[in-house]
């Protein structure tokens, strides 16, 4: 390959600001960010690939809205891509997104507008009811990871996402952030030997030291037992994916 790049697919409220900080600290002005229209899918990845090619001096890229794609699309152009992706307990991710977006008083995208005008339960219900907003609160990780096999029409999203998980050279876990940084450093140093992945926390809504069970209890008390059950049901596939990544970290993959 003529070129190796790092691409942070910045999944909202999955420690992405910390990852961007690390990339910028390592690469300075060779780290770039940009956002895209999520749909149509093929137009999105066309624009993402064009961006990568046009930013010929850049080494590290980051975007909330770049869709995941088959790496061979870049390899044909002589570019090797190392995707950087983090996953998180799906219910906690949605809860963090809600509290973060409530504070965005000058932003008028759907998420912040909804969050500022309703409680957490209402936030979930409204986003579920709006076409192309529902993925934000229902199987978000599966939706995003399945993009790697977007063209496989005979496969279910969870099946695609689990295959993507196996193909990715790196997958981070917010709940194991320090271990994730070690793994990221090992992965990137194969191509950039001086790379350092320091452990930092930014845009934190709740204490990172709060036990997961305690955070889930807070959410359950906030929305009630019945709605919490619904939250779990509409994120059932995301839970399967998250638990798979948890197991990978337990096994020291």
Swiss-Prot record:
Q: Which residues form the signal peptide?
A: 1-15
Give the top-rank taxon of the lineage listed in the UniProt record for this protein: Archaea
GO MF annotation, one: sulfotransferase activity
Keyword flag Signal: yes
Arranged from A to Z, the UniProt key words for this protein are: Signal
User: What would be one Gene Ontology cellular-component term for the protein?
Assistant: membrane
> How is this protein named in the record?
Uncharacterized protein AF_0307
User: Which species is this UniProt entry from?
Assistant: Archaeoglobus fulgidus (strain ATCC 49558 / DSM 4304 / JCM 9628 / NBRC 100126 / VC-16)
């Amino acid at each position: 390959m003529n070129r190796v790049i790092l691409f942070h697919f910045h999944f909202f409220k999955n420690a992405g600001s910390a990852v961007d900080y690390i990339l910028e600290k390592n690469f300075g002005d060779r780290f770039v960010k940009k956002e895209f229209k999520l749909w149509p899918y093929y137009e999105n990845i066309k624009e993402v690939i064009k961006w990568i090619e046009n930013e010929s001096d850049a080494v590290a890229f980051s975007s909330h809205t770049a869709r995941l794609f088959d790496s061979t699309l870049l390899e044909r152009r002589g570019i090797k891509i190392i995707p950087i992706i983090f996953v998180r307990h799906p219910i906690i991710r949605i809860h963090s997104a809600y509290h973060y977006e409530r504070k965005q008083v000058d932003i008028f995208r759907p998420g912040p507008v909804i969050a500022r005008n309703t409680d957490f339960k209402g936030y979930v219900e409204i986003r579920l009811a709006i076409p192309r907003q529902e993925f934000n609160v229902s199987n978000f990780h599966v939706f995003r990871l399945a993009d790697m096999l977007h063209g496989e029409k005979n496969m279910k999203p969870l099946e695609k996402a689990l295959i993507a998980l196996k193909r990715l050279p790196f997958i981070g876990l917010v709940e194991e952030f320090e271990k994730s940084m070690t793994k990221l450093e090992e992965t990137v140093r194969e191509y950039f030997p001086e790379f350092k992945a320091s452990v930092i926390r930014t845009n934190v809504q709740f204490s990172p030291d709060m036990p997961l069970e305690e955070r889930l209890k807070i959410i359950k008390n906030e929305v009630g037992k019945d709605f919490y059950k619904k939250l779990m049901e509409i994120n059932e596939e995301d839970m399967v994916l998250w638990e798979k990544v948890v197991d990978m970290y337990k096994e020291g993959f």
